């Protein structure tokens, strides 16, 4: 099926260049033709950048600098039998353009060097190859300065104003529908094709118990409706440790391809969920809630979104490198249930 999608697309769009990590000459020619590099910077070295699922992301190392090329194709790169919205990379580029004048936001993101709308390619500054924050799941901690920096970025994002004429650009409806399916629907579907016991023995039984909780499923559905609301705030849409990159001078935020105009509570909830999944201390969680309170956001929605994100990362398709057995995963599903059904208890379930 994956080869079918590629072949069908290539036949229908013969004028679109599909980047190939193994074709260095073609990539050098692409960059030269767009005046993004000079002859004196070549030859280059081309390699995959990161372990992202959605897109082809390449690091092009030149004589004295490096670039990131990111191309979204109409399939999920790691699961190329799954179709995905082709416009996502262009919308991500529009996010970079929209925040450019707000230095507290753009200064903590790679610089956008070019958008190729025909081939759906972004050319970005290389934020560095020292890794992202997914080591949190092993380390079970995040430093207070790092957490403060991440929350300051979210606060600054809340100050970004999108002009009326740009509003439709950021509906990002196709990507939001895809995300909605994988966050709010698929994990709790009775027959979703996931063999959870292959991931962790006993996880299928734990998931079945949660799926039988009608109140929980109803509240998740309501939160899914809230996620689909068109709001006035620019939302990153995937604010988790894989989108936080360690650079020499601090943190860089990447991959806003799921961005949309909606409710800010979603980003805070996702962030809170990953602190729970990393088993970070309750003080870190309190810091997130204190920050959302300062932004006058709805606690019930932040906590609810956190609960849903915990569940989808445990029993959904988008698995994480979690070093836990079934007892810890059952406990985390209980945390999710409490956050969704009893948000008035706030962090009483946290441990």
Regions found by a protein language model. Give the residues of each.
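Low-complexity, highly charged intrinsically disordered N-terminal segments
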Residues: 2-5, 56, 72
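Regulatory N- and C-terminal appendages and interdomain linkers associated
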Residues: 1-47, 319-351
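Active-site Asp-x-Gly
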Residues: 78-88, 232-234, 245-287
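Active-site catalytic-loop/activation-segment of kinase and kinase-like phosphoryl-transfer enzymes
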Residues: 2-22, 168-223, 315
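ATP-binding pocket architecture of kinase catalytic cores
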Residues: 49, 58-169
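Active-site activation/catalytic loop segments of kinase-like enzymes and analogous catalytic loops
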Residues: 94, 264-296, 306-325, 339
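Short secondary-structure junctions
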Residues: 35-42, 103-108, 295-296
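Active-site acidic catalytic loop and adjacent metal/ATP-binding pocket
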Residues: 47-69, 217-266
């Amino acid at each position: 099926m994956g080869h079918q999608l590629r072949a069908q697309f290539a036949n229908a769009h013969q004028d679109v260049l599909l980047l190939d990590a193994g074709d260095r000459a073609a990539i050098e020619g692409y960059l030269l033709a767009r005046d993004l590099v000079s002859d004196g910077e070549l030859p280059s070295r081309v390699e995959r950048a990161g372990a992202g699922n959605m897109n082809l992301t390449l690091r092009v190392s030149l004589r004295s600098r490096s670039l990131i090329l990111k191309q979204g194709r109409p399939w999920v790169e790691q699961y190329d039998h799954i179709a995905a919205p082709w416009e996502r990379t262009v919308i991500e580029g529009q996010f970079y353009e929209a925040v450019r004048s707000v230095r507290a936001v753009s200064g903590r993101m790679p610089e956008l060097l070019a958008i190729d709308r025909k081939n759906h390619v972004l050319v970005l500054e290389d934020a560095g190859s020292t890794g992202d924050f997914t080591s949190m799941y092993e380390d079970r901690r995040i430093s207070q300065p790092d957490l403060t920096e991440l929350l300051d970025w979210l606060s600054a994002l809340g100050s970004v104003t999108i002009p009326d004429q740009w509003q439709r650009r950021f509906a990002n409806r196709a990507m939001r529908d895809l995300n909605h399916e994988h966050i709010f629907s698929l994990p709790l579907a009775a027959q979703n094709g996931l063999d959870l016991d292959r991931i962790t023995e006993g996880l299928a039984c734990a998931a079945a118990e949660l799926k039988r909780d009608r109140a929980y499923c109803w509240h998740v559905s309501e939160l899914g409706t809230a996620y689909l609301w068109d709001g006035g705030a620019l939302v990153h849409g995937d604010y988790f440790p894989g989108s936080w990159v360690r650079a020499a001078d601090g943190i860089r935020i990447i991959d806003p391809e799921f961005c949309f105009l909606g409710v800010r509570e979603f980003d805070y909830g996702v962030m809170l969920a990953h602190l729970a999944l990393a088993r970070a201390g309750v003080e870190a969680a309190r810091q997130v809630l204190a920050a959302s309170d300062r932004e006058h956001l709805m606690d019930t929605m932040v906590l609810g979104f956190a609960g849903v994100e915990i569940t989808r990362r445990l029993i959904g398709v988008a698995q994480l490198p979690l070093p836990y057995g079934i007892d810890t995963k059952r406990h985390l599903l209980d945390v999710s249930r409490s956050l969704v059904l009893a948000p008035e208890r706030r962090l009483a379930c946290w441990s």
